């Protein structure tokens, strides 16, 4: 077994809490499948037979009851009161990890050819290989935003070599001063660096086993994304000998601590005697200067996905966008599953668009139009209803003559007769009164708050 696959399904979805307060984030419906189905399906498609899923007890119960895959999941539940980052989660399952690791987030939806990331990891004997995509701005409004401009998220500054594969620099603009400082040791080996500010981390990582060993002994690192990876990128161009020389100048106790926590001591234990493959050294000849990979002990690489679907469902806007895009993806992944479930009852079938999905046991009345929308299971949509560019979860009732556009309607909500709803988020169990007009509103329970 070359890799052990690990799916992280612990995060509570802090940026979409009005959705996740009643449904755990890994179980949020996307295209009428739980969100966690997508990374699990990706692994199964490329031949993984086992996967470790780190999650909560609520998600474990649902997976055990509904898991319909050939792949065998080893579900590990974190303590209910634990506040664990992704690095903490790897430490928690450390006794199970015997080989190099492939880590995925439960909110990743992608049709990437996974072998492109894995082949990069193999060819260059990398410490880390990760997946990134070019950022894509959705032109669709986000429900409940009330006309405000979308908050500008801080960018990552990503530096790569002339091949676009070697990851040379990585920092968030929040961590940078007014000037961008590049170490001389990097420029010596790579005088030409190409910087990107529009790339998004997909949270898919191949990691050497010694990286996990290092994490086990360094409890101060809690996050793979924000702490471990920037550390590894920086460590590529500092030698073990210079690190040791620096440590010798410190006090004895501090020197001993640094030595035990530094990545190079773990590389020595793992594979100091194993030089990088000849092919890797040869491949590194491309560009301005030849680099002897056998001397560069920490090596970080990135596969930048330029085409296809690659999205992380981390906000309401991205959740809506994922539901718009997955019908096309599912037609390729699950061609045996029709977009309209066989148990659904639809009076005016010609008014249901081919770009929509209809779940089991749903009833749609006469002259009701469904366009570019995902409708969950056991919904009741009565006569003369118009639903456009929406997501309706399970057991939603929409009464006669209602019009819903660009909205998310959560489980068990009721939209009464003649209501007009546009760009809204209606929480679980909420009721919208007859003939109401709602625009750009978030209507949820008092215990549900969200950052949009």
UniProtKB/Swiss-Prot annotation:
Pfam families recorded: LbH_EIF2B, NTP_transferase
Characterize the regulation of its activity.
Activated by the chemical integrated stress response (ISR) inhibitor ISRIB which stimulates guanine nucleotide exchange factor activity for both phosphorylated and unphosphorylated eIF2.
Please tell me one Gene Ontology term that the record gives under cellular component.
cytosol
Q: Where is the signal peptide?
A: none
Q: Which GO terms describe its molecular function?
A: guanyl-nucleotide exchange factor activity; translation initiation factor activity
Instruction: Answer whether the UniProt record assigns the keyword Phosphoprotein to this protein.
Output: yes
What sections of the sequence does the record tag as coiled-coil?
Answer: none
Q: Where does this chain mainly localize?
A: cytoplasm
Q: Does the keyword section mention Protein biosynthesis?
A: yes
Q: Which InterPro entries match?
A: eIF2B_gamma (IPR051960), NTP_transferase_dom (IPR005835), Nucleotide-diphossugar_trans (IPR029044)
Q: Where in the cell is it found?
A: Cytoplasm, Cytosol
Superkingdom: Eukaryota
GO BP, sorted A to Z: cytoplasmic translational initiation; oligodendrocyte development; response to glucose; response to heat; response to peptide hormone; T cell receptor signaling pathway; translational initiation
Q: What is the protein's known function? A: Acts as a component of the translation initiation factor 2B (eIF2B) complex, which catalyzes the exchange of GDP for GTP on the eukaryotic initiation factor 2 (eIF2) complex gamma subunit. Its guanine nucleotide exchange factor activity is repressed when bound to eIF2 complex phosphorylated on the alpha subunit, thereby limiting the amount of methionyl-initiator methionine tRNA available to the ribosome and consequently global translation is repressed.
So what family is this one in? Belongs to the eIF-2B gamma/epsilon subunits family.
Q: How does it assemble?
A: Component of the translation initiation factor 2B (eIF2B) complex which is a heterodecamer of two sets of five different subunits: alpha, beta, gamma, delta and epsilon. Subunits alpha, beta and delta comprise a regulatory subcomplex and subunits epsilon and gamma comprise a catalytic subcomplex. Within the complex, the hexameric regulatory complex resides at the center, with the two heterodimeric catalytic subcomplexes bound on opposite sides.
Descriptive protein name: Translation initiation factor eIF2B subunit gamma
Biological source species = Homo sapiens
Q: Which gene encodes it?
A: EIF2B3
